[in-house]
Design a protein with these regions (language model features):
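Short, low-complexity cationic-aromatic patches
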Residues: 35-38, 52-63, 79-80, 95-103, ...
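Conserved short histidine dyad/triad with adjacent acidic residue
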Residues: 22-33, 42-59, 177-197, 243
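A structural feature that tracks compact, well-ordered secondary-structure segments
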Residues: 45-47, 73, 110-111, 178-182, ...
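Double-stranded beta-helix
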Residues: 102-162, 173, 206-237, 248-291
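A short, N-terminal "cap"/entry segment at the start of jelly-roll beta-barrel domains
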Residues: 1-39, 120-175, 179-180, 283-291
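A short beta-strand-loop-beta hairpin characteristic of the jelly-roll/cupin
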Residues: 49-87, 202-233
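Conserved metal-binding segment of the jelly-roll/cupin
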Residues: 82-103, 110-113, 228-251, 258-262
């Protein structure tokens, strides 16, 4: 029998080490698949660069780098790209990238090499151009959404990062999906589920933020007998496919999170099957395809 995607979290301590390096967030042993892999289709990594140069390489169709710390530049796909904390970079096939920083930097790096390894194929065609999503623009858009009296009440207060090459899926690449999300202080973002695996990265938070994950809902539309993942800035955790999950902020400050999924592929295959719970409170709870 094929094993399920496990619950697993990854400590942010790697981002404090004194030397450059790459840490694959590998659960391939639990998945019983050729490694390394964080989900059947994706591999997430922590990357640390200390005053110098580091090369990354992946036999993948899509790579996403989120700049968690620092500033510098990257040479990839025949281009030199300047980056700073909070920026997002995506690169297509031809997986080598050379990163430079004069100080200290950290990336959250996700790519789809495990999917290609399973299929026994290599990426031969660039499906999109190297793209940078600047933090300042994403943050301004997120603030606009959070300030609007209508959109601020949405199930998720977030900016969906999308590439114009993929107008049907509206995703950051043809396989990857990424969202720059806000979890406002004192708020609960109610349960929803989807058939893509989420590799969540906590950008910033204070103690008191967490995600509840589980397979069932109670009569009030909240997660029944859930597994709790406490947030910590720079940490990552896995949300298994098909599991309900809700986000909670019991701290006194806003928090930010970056879920990355294989939902670009699922959306194209029409297998995402996203559902939202609408808890009861003063009325009967229900589930729908609308947030």
């Amino acid at each position: 029998m094929i094993p399920p995607v496990p619950y697993h979290s990854f400590s942010p301590d790697f981002f404090q080490q004194k030397t450059s390096g790459i840490l694959p967030l590998d659960v391939s042993r639990q998945l019983k698949c050729p490694g390394p892999a964080t989900s059947p289709a994706l591999l997430a990594n922590f990357v640390r660069i200390v005053k110098g140069t580091l090369k990354t390489n992946a036999l993948a169709t899509s790579q996403l780098f989120f700049v968690f710390q620092g500033a510098g530049r990257t040479e990839a796909c025949g281009r030199t790209i300047e980056w700073k904390e909070g920026d997002f970079m995506v690169f297509p096939a031809h997986g080598e990238a050379i990163h430079h920083t004069e100080g200290e930097a950290g990336f959250y790096w996700v790519h789809d090499a495990p999917l290609l390894r399973y299929l026994g194929v290599t990426a031969t065609e660039e499906r999109f151009h190297p793209t940078v999503f600047e933090h300042s623009k994403a943050a301004a858009k997120l603030q606009q959404i959070a300030s609007d009296p209508v959109t601020s009440q949405a199930n998720r207060v977030s900016v969906l990062l999308a590439n114009s090459n993929f107008p049907q899926t509206r995703t950051i690449t043809h396989t990857l999906w990424a969202m720059f999300g806000l979890l406002p202080k004192g708020k609960v973002q109610y349960p929803h589920r989807h058939e893509s695996v989420a590799l969540d990265f906590v950008i910033s938070c204070k103690p008191g933020c967490y995600t509840m994950i589980g397979t069932e809902l109670d009569s009030d539309g909240m997660i029944k007998n859930g597994h709790r993942e406490n947030w910590k800035s720079g940490a990552s955790f896995i949300t298994p496919a098909g599991y309900w999950h809700s986000h909670h902020n019991e701290s006194g400050e806003d928090a930010h999170v970056l879920p990355i999924q294989d939902a670009g592929l699922h959306t194209y295959l029409r297998t995402l099957d996203i559902l939202y719970s609408h808890p009861g409170h003063d009325k009967t709870s229900y589930i729908s395809q609308r947030p």
